[in-house]
UniProtKB/Swiss-Prot annotation:
Name this polypeptide is given: High osmolarity signaling protein sho1
TM ranges: 23-43, 53-73, 82-102, 112-132
Single GO cellular component term: plasma membrane
Compartments reported by the entry: Cell membrane
One Pfam family hit: SH3_1
Membrane association type: Multi-pass membrane protein
Subunit structure: Forms homooligomers.
Domain of life: Eukaryota
Annotated segments matching region Disordered: 150-176, 191-233
Organism: Pyrenophora tritici-repentis (strain Pt-1C-BFP) (Wheat tan spot fungus)
Keyword match Transmembrane: yes
Extracellular side: 44-52, 103-111
């Protein structure tokens, strides 16, 4: 589980529901199922013999559906997904128990109420499977790809990676020039592969020369040295990863690379939170692992 998801808009907007086919379909079916169960329960109670337990199920599921609707419209699903799964799991017990109390009755209103509770149970199972899975899960990635507010660079605020990842040692102080980072500097969360365009070795090694680009300079116009080209060519990329979100590189960090959602990248090492990757056009650099999924 990620510890932080970055800042996201907390405003309530029905457009997030309308723009998300999965949320729109499941919430609509859930509301319809609740109405069927509610109306049928009233008619069943008039006939007599309706189990009182089923009324509590209706009240509980009303707040569950309302809670899911509010979290989706507020773009707070990843913040409250654990609570959502917990309440829905309890609701599933209530709805299935109500079905068991009603489905065997020959009275038509009882059967209609049972049908409503069955629909509520089915929607609850779907929600538990969706919200109980990580955002990187294949089925969630597929479902979220159709949501308008979760697509493209504009949805950066809804991605499951904390903005704190960019606060690595090399970017905390703008006066420090870019360099090849050692495992001690990175505390073990970077890959040990050398970054493209930078000579290897610890900070201050003799292999470093003035051809390395500097912040704010015109380093992009300089030609890499022969040693750097050999070093870059020696890196192997045995893994392939697919981008599940678009990522815009930090302009203050020349090591990072930008990529678009669904891009296929070659990866040299998958042991840290930042992976050494190569784009199809040959550009190399580091990419956040939470934006990628191995193929």
């Amino acid at each position: 589980m990620e510890n932080g998801y970055g800042q996201r808009s907390q405003g309530f907007s029905l457009g997030r529901i309308i723009g998300d086919p999965f949320a729109l379909a499941t919430i609509s079916i859930g509301i319809l199922a609740w109405i069927i169960a509610f109306v049928s329960s009233i008619i069943s109670a008039i006939h007599g013999g309706f189990p009182n337990f089923a009324w509590w199920t209706l009240v509980f599921m009303f707040f569950c559906i309302a809670g899911v609707t509010i979290t989706v419209a507020s773009d707070a699903e990843r913040t409250y997904h654990v609570a959502i799964v917990g309440f829905l799991s309890a609701g599933l017990v209530f709805t299935t128990s109500s079905v068991n109390s009603l489905v065997y009755s020959p009275v038509a209103p009882f059967e209609a109420a049972a049908a409503g509770y069955i629909l509520l149970s089915m929607i609850t199972i779907v929600w538990v499977f969706y919200y109980g899975s990580q955002p990187q899960a294949s089925h969630r990635t597929f479902v979220d790809s159709y949501a308008l507010h979760k697509e493209g660079p504009g949805s950066r605020s809804s991605r499951p990676i904390s903005n704190g990842y960019t606060n690595r040692p090399e970017t905390q102080n703008a006066s420090i020039p870019p360099q090849m980072y050692t495992s001690a500097q990175l505390n073990g969360f970077e890959t040990s592969s050398p970054v493209s365009g930078y000579p290897g070795g610890p900070a201050g090694a003799n292999g470093r020369n003035s051809s390395a680009p500097q912040f704010g300079g015109m380093g992009n116009s300089q030609t890499p040295t022969h040693d750097e080209q050999q070093q870059e060519a020696s890196i192997e990329y045995p893994y392939r990863a697919k981008a599940i979100y678009s990522y815009e590189a930090n302009p203050d960090d020349a090591n990072e690379i930008s990529f678009q959602k669904h891009d296929i990248l070659e990866v040299s090492d998958v042991s840290g939170r930042w992976w050494q990757a190569k784009k199809p056009n040959g550009e190399t650099g580091i990419a956040p692992s939470n934006y990628l999924i191995l193929l």
